[in-house]
């Protein structure tokens, strides 16, 4: 919270105080503005509630996931996420291998962790990426049919992705060579798609080669 406060003040000072303008009574306008920004920042940080992730761990292997780099684990990983959500939140851990998956949906209170040495691999089969039609659709969704992604969340609270491992989306052209992918339209899945989510954490994780931005 302190870092957010200081960052807010610093950015606003850079934007709004490019010159050291002198005001009345020898107090610069910059000083006055920084003081006001400090008051605003203090007010904002009072309303920030850091997310403390529950201690419960949900290892995807206990739900049937196999980290052999080829088995499709969408159902197993989603089972772990759903169990974590029902339990009131915690960490869904991916460890000890390479886990292929299609679209998985994060839910409130769930922290998805890819542990050190582990990798989450995006499926290269478009059939593993079902459409997720959001409540409020954008131009990109309606016209270009951008509705597929590897990781999806909508209206989730306290949700995140962390770990020292890697999410490799495998979005290279060679993996999506069909005519439906030409022009980067509906055939290229997003990496992470979060809509109307609050208190989102993205920490430590390496993200590589998403098929779409």
Describe the role of every protein-language-model region.
Residues 22-213:
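Extracellular/periplasmic carbohydrate-active domains that bind, remodel
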